Design a protein with these regions (language model features):
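Post-signal peptide N-terminal regions of Sec-secreted extracellular proteins
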Residues: 7-10, 15-18, 48, 52-54, ...
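A short, structured beta-strand/loop element
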Residues: 23-68, 80
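N-terminal first-folded block
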Residues: 1-32
Length: 80
């Protein structure tokens, strides 16, 4: 899927009807990253404290690479 070529109306409809997931490790706080799995292999990520901002859209492959990087520790903050 070419996420840059997606129809805006389709994306808006998908986001309006999206089922957003929050990690069980977030303790129900308001500083959470939320994910929604849309049709056509599109994944949306948003910040629960900034719901007025549009979410970031990823392909399934991009999302899998992102999660893989987290799991491998590749996205840790560098030592200061």
């Amino acid at each position: 899927v070419n996420k840059n070529a997606l129809d805006t109306a389709w994306v808006e409809a998908q986001l309006r009807d999206a089922r957003w997931h929050t990690s069980s490790l977030s303790s129900g706080g308001t500083n959470c990253v939320q994910v929604a799995f849309l049709e056509r292999g599109v994944v949306a990520l948003r910040d629960s404290k900034n719901l007025d901002k549009p979410p970031h859209l990823f392909t399934d492959a991009e999302y899998d690479a992102f999660i893989g990087g987290i799991e491998r520790g590749e996205l840790r903050r560098p030592e200061r």
